[in-house]
């Protein structure tokens, strides 16, 4: 994933988003039982450890139109990517939120009053955010993982994870069974893909921060050229099943696709494993169980970065992933073999270009416009109600010359696409006038989605009918969080002059 060649407002969408809530996944053999998920997943990004984003609350299709603003809280952090790009977690009536300066706040859900704040003032491109577990709030800055006391915000430990100057951290951690999971990525806030960066997933002891094991998502040899190559890494919190496995998606290889020096990725021959992949490991040891690569030898920054959604459909345990190639893939969770694939959004036939370049057949790649572009496809996490998958889509192109150089694309628009989890067929879609950089969230028979220009939409999960729209005071590039009768929407980036980012709490009846 790269931030080069795009204006500031568009860059924010590259900071992938996570959303957080409290819910259990019912009827999912691949993940934990519903009861276990509710306890283990409390405060987990993606709602639960299966990353279903299926929240518990009193909001449904009969009353969602009664949502009104209850309170607001200014977002004052400063970075090149706005003030905020992650959804807070909500645990026992307290919101835990991290801004794009890496600062963490605990906020009273009822009143919006700040209970405590931990300042780091370390600008981050995002997505970042926190996970709450075992009395601690776990998070990251651009170079360390840390644990804070859940009640006071006092730092318990901090662990340096970077192995070189070409690496950074841009994710909310995962937490499971006494371990915290954090990945580096081969890019920094100041220099995208400087070369030599290896995306590495670390498992840390939750009590001490001590490193237990690590998994290199790409080889340290970097396919033969450690000066300019790099790649992989995890941008989103991983998922876990009840068999002790961890699932995650990975980023693209570098150099950045389309650079004049290496337009077809000549410096990194081969498929560039394990980039653009879903990977399953033993969570206790880091042992590789299987991998699936969606885009070998990626040329277009088509990360397969979404957190896998774990569920059961038609008696089969599935791990459903997606990324910037704009293809949703359901894999058999036991074997990693594809069950179905569903392209979403706009495509125009460049899916095999990486394979052509890998075979030395670059002349067969057609110059012109490429869909999805570098800011297109599925950028944000998906959600599910157990039978339908809700996919946020960004439609936007890039251009490619006959010599392999990439250029800027055009305007971005968005969609929310509902896919039957069993068959992979599209049930309905809703189009937005701006990009869908935020993850959808399900609560009962309602799915809540956001559009970059500052809108929050509620749709009926079965029909796709629009039920409610909220207008925010600034742009939003993340999903909402839901608890009880309240929706928390971080409007984290000014998209027009005079706008001021702030968190808006919507509540039934105001």
Predicted regions and their residues:
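Bacterial signal peptide processing site
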Residues: 29-31
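C-terminal motif of bacterial Sec signal peptides marking the signal peptidase cleavage site
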Residues: 24-27
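Short loop/turn segments that connect beta-strands within beta-propeller blades
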Residues: 108-111, 149-152, 206-208, 283-285, ...
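Surface-exposed loop and turn segments in beta-propeller and other repeat-based domains
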Residues: 72-78, 120-123, 160-164, 214-228, ...
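Conserved blade-ending motifs and adjacent loop-strand segments that build the rim/top face
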Residues: 298-299, 348-350, 357-365, 431-438, ...
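Blade/loop signatures of beta-propeller domains
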Residues: 34-70, 405, 411
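A structural motif specific to WD40 beta-propellers
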Residues: 70, 113-117, 154-158, 212-213, ...
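Repeat-blade elements of multi-bladed beta-propeller folds
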Residues: 39-47, 81-103, 122-145, 168-194, ...
């Amino acid at each position: 994933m790269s931030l080069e060649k795009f204006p500031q407002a568009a860059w924010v969408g590259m900071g992938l988003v996570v959303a957080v809530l409290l819910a259990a996944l019912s009827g999912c053999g691949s993940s934990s039982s519903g009861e276990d998920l509710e306890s283990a997943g409390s405060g987990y990004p993606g709602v639960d450890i299966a990353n279903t984003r299926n929240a518990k609350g009193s909001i449904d299709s009969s009353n969602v139109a009664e949502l009104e603003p209850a309170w607001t809280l200014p977002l004052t952090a400063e970075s090149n990517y706005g003030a905020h790009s992650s959804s807070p977690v909500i645990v026992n009536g307290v919101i835990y939120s991290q801004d794009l300066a890496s600062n963490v706040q605990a906020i009273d859900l009822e009143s919006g009053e700040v209970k405590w704040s931990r300042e780091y003032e370390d600008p981050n491109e995002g997505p970042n955010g926190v996970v709450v577990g075992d009395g601690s709030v776990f998070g990251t800055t651009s170079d360390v993982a840390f644990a804070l006391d859940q009640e006071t915000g006092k730092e318990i430990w901090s662990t340096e994870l970077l192995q070189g100057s070409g690496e950074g951290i841009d994710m909310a951690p995962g937490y499971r069974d006494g371990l915290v999971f954090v990945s580096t990525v081969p890019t920094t806030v100041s220099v995208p893909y400087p070369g030599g960066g290896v995306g590495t997933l670390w498992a840390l002891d939750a009590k001490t921060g001590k490193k237990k094991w690590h998994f290199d998502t790409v080889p340290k040899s970097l396919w033969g050229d450690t000066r300019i190559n790099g790649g992989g890494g995890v941008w989103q919190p991983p998922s876990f099943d009840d068999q002790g496995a961890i699932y995650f998606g990975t980023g693209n290889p570098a150099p950045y696709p389309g650079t004049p020096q290496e337009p077809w990725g000549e410096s990194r021959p081969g498929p560039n494993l394990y980039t653009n992949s879903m990977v399953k490991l033993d969570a206790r040891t880091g042992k590789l169980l299987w991998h699936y690569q969606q885009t070998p030898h990626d040329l277009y920054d088509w990360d397969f970065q979404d957190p896998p959604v774990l569920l059961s459909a038609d008696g089969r345990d599935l791990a459903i992933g997606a990324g910037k190639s704009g293809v949703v893939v359901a894999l058999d969770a036991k074997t990693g073999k594809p069950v179905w694939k569903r392209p979403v959004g706009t495509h125009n036939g460049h899916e095999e270009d990486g394979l052509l370049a890998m075979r030395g057949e670059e002349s067969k790649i057609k110059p012109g416009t490429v869909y999805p572009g570098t800011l297109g496809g599925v950028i944000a996490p998906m959600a599910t109600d157990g039978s339908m998958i809700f996919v946020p889509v960004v439609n936007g192109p890039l251009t490619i010359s006959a010599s392999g150089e990439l250029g800027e694309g055009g305007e971005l628009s968005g969609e929310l696409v509902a896919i039957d989890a069993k068959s992979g067929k599209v049930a309905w879609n809703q189009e937005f006038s701006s990009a869908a950089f935020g993850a959808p969230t399900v609560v009962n028979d309602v799915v809540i989605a956001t559009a970059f220009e500052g809108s929050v939409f509620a749709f009926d999960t079965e029909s796709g009918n629009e039920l409610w729209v909220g207008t925010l005071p600034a742009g939003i590039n993340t999903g909402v969080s839901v608890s009880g009768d309240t929706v928390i929407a971080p409007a984290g980036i000014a998209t027009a002059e005079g706008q001021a980012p702030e968190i808006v709490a919507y509540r039934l009846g105001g």
